[in-house]
Regions:
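Short beta-strand segments enriched in small/hydrophobic residues
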Residues: 1-14, 67-68, 129-135
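Short, glycine/acidic-enriched loop or turn micro-motifs at the edges of active sites
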Residues: 4, 44, 138
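Alpha-helical elements of the RecA-like P-loop NTPase motor core of helicases
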Residues: 7, 47, 74, 115, ...
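Beta-alpha junction/loop-to-helix N-cap segments that form part of ligand/metal-binding clefts
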Residues: 8-15, 27-97, 106, 167-171
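Short, amphipathic alpha-helical "lid/cap" segments that border enzyme active or binding sites
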Residues: 50-53, 114-118, 145, 173-177
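Active-site segment of extracytoplasmic enzymes that catalyze sulfate/phosphate-ester chemistry
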Residues: 100
């Protein structure tokens, strides 16, 4: 997305891809072929992402680099799988976003992040009792929290409070913080 709440991620991806393509094309392309790049803004919305995918497919796209965020990526992977289209996401972390053999990710998954966070806290003796505040309306936040809680239990870390909030209440955390005391 280059607009909406996740625009910072989509803009960074778009700029990074463009820099790489410019460098490759200036060096003669790939086996003499220049790379053509077309970008569509999905606004981090699943329906718009599927529509963007179809627009790019109609344009003649041969591989998809995207989408950037998990929920739209999970919707689009159904389409790329049906079309046998190679898909590479730079940053969709939900497990479901690469559930088929045509889709790959360049970063860690939600469970990997949750596990690594609990491991880090345990290995560095940072805490034995932990309070967690997470966005229950967000796939990313919920996915990280689930694996964190599982790994924390395995490691003997005590989650003394696990307080959720939703996207429409993300400006005041006083209730959650009070419960975490």
């Amino acid at each position: 997305p280059t607009t909406g709440d996740a625009a910072i991620y989509g803009t960074a991806v778009q700029n990074g891809i463009q820099l790489a393509i410019d460098e490759i094309n200036e060096a003669g392309g790939i086996n003499g072929y220049q790379i053509e790049f077309k970008f569509e803004d999905d606004q981090s919305d699943s329906e718009k992402s599927v529509n963007a995918y179809n627009t790019l497919k109609d344009w003649g796209m041969q591989m998809l680099v995207g989408t950037t965020t998990s929920t739209p990526c999970t919707a689009v992977v159904e389409e790329t799988h049906a079309d046998n289209m190679f898909q590479l996401t730079p940053s969709a972390t939900a497990v479901e976003s690469i559930q088929y053999d045509n889709a790959f990710r360049m970063c860690f998954s939600d469970p990997d992040q949750g596990k690594a966070s609990a491991d880090y806290i345990s290995e560095n003796n940072l805490a034995k009792k932990i309070a967690v505040i997470y966005n229950s309306s967000d796939t990313y936040s919920s996915g990280v929290y689930q694996k964190f809680a599982e790994q924390a239990k395995t490691l003997g870390l005590d989650i003394v409070a696990a307080e959720a909030f939703t996207a429409d209440s993300k400006t005041d955390f006083s209730v959650q913080l009070q419960k975490a005391k």
